[in-house]
Design a protein with these regions (language model features):
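Short helix-coil boundary/hinge micro-motifs
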Residues: 1-152, 159-160, 198-199
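N-terminal cysteine/histidine-rich coordination modules
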Residues: 154, 158, 162-163, 167-199
Length: 199
């Protein structure tokens, strides 16, 4: 459970927004910044997820209805579960099913760009647009290989989503100096206790 945020690797570019989305619930402290529809609306607005590229975001925040609020929380849980699978290389089928179900409700389009790239772009309005951005960023990260580096800390009392920037992609903890160190100390203590037991 790292308390030093500077030790936690932020995901690069737009994937950082998805990382923040996954970390909007803090397992260590038991806090959730997306407790209400108003919280979700404010969170999306802070990250400009209610607007398209080149558009100015309206001053009035779109309302997030009950159905969209439920979808946001389901999406966060499912994406956290999928990120957890990045250590093993296999995502939980129920999490994938949830993301697919939500994605089917969000209108999207493939956009071709002048630099010979394609982008998945959400077309909806309000919460639908914001959910679409989370999905589009995740889609892009999965296709570029960046998603596989977004993981949940192996410390069960932490579970922070971190970006594994290690060369060999074997990062396990959000911070080696806290969660990783604690795990190593526990393992050492268990080995010492095992040696101290009479035969």
């Amino acid at each position: 459970m790292s308390t030093d945020l500077s030790q936690r690797a932020p995901a690069p570019g737009a994937l950082g927004v998805v990382q923040q989305f996954l970390n909007s619930v803090d397992i260590a402290s038991g806090t959730d910044v997306l407790r209400t529809s108003a919280d979700v609306s404010a969170w999306f607005a802070e990250r400009r997820l209610f607007s398209r590229p080149g558009e100015q975001q309206a001053d009035a925040l779109p309302e997030v209805g009950d159905a969209d609020f439920g979808r946001v929380l389901q999406l966060r849980t499912a994406l956290r579960d999928i990120a957890e699978g990045n250590l093993t290389g296999r995502a939980a089928p129920s999490a994938v099913e949830t993301v697919n179900r939500i994605a089917a409700l969000v209108p999207m389009a493939v956009r071709f760009d002048t630099d010979n790239t394609t982008l998945l772009t959400p077309l909806g309005e309000g919460a639908e647009l914001a959910i679409g951005w989370i999905l589009a960023i995740t889609f892009d990260a999965m296709n570029t290989g960046m998603w596989q580096r977004l993981r949940l800390c192996a410390a069960t009392d932490c579970r922070f989503a971190f970006y594994d920037a290690s060369r060999n992609r074997t990062g396990t903890w959000c911070s080696m100096s806290t969660c990783g160190n604690r795990a190593k100390v526990r393992a050492y203590q268990q080995r010492q206790r095992g040696r101290a037991l009479p035969a």
